[in-house]
Amino acid sequence: SGVKIASGEYIGWCHADLQTEPMDVYNAYLANSEQLKNEKVIIKGLRTNRNMFDGIFTLGMSVFVSIVFQRIINDINAQPKLFSKNFIKFLNHHPHDFSLDLYLLIIAKLKNYKIINHRVILKKRLYGEAKGGGNIKGKLKLIIRTFIYIFQLRKKMWKL
């Protein structure tokens, strides 16, 4: 993956749907460059300009994950994500789907990293449909898949 071959001191990503732009990664870096010098920091997006349905969905998932893992985590899939390249060593057993954002944040919390929210304006999707579904049926499938992964990850974390 691009993360593994990246050669910079910091690694960042955003989703390809351009609801947040690649420039948001750069802006997050500029706004938080001093904090990033402390290697135990993750910068993550905090989406603004969301519709009410998606906002409620995100809040519900944030509360659920915070309860299950006993650590406060909000707006899990917000983009961008930005961190020191040294953090990659903790991502050996990462999922290969949209659960990556959740995995990264849980590992960061377990390793006592500080998570800093960086506000981004969520833009309208220009092409295609959200993998999480732009409708109720898609959201329900995403919720079920995510809940299964959350419980699998929690069980795995108990073994560590």
Specify the residue positions occupied by each region the protein language model found.
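Acceptor/aglycone-binding surface of glycosyltransferases and processive sugar-polymer synthases
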Residues: S1-I5, Y10-W13, P22-F98, R125-F147
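Cofactor-binding loops of NAD(P)H-dependent oxidoreductases
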Residues: C14-A16, H118
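Acidic metal-phosphate-binding loop of nucleotide-sugar-dependent transferases
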Residues: L18-T20
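Catalytic donor-sugar/metal-binding loop of nucleotide-sugar-dependent glycosyltransferases
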Residues: I72, H93-H96, I106-K123
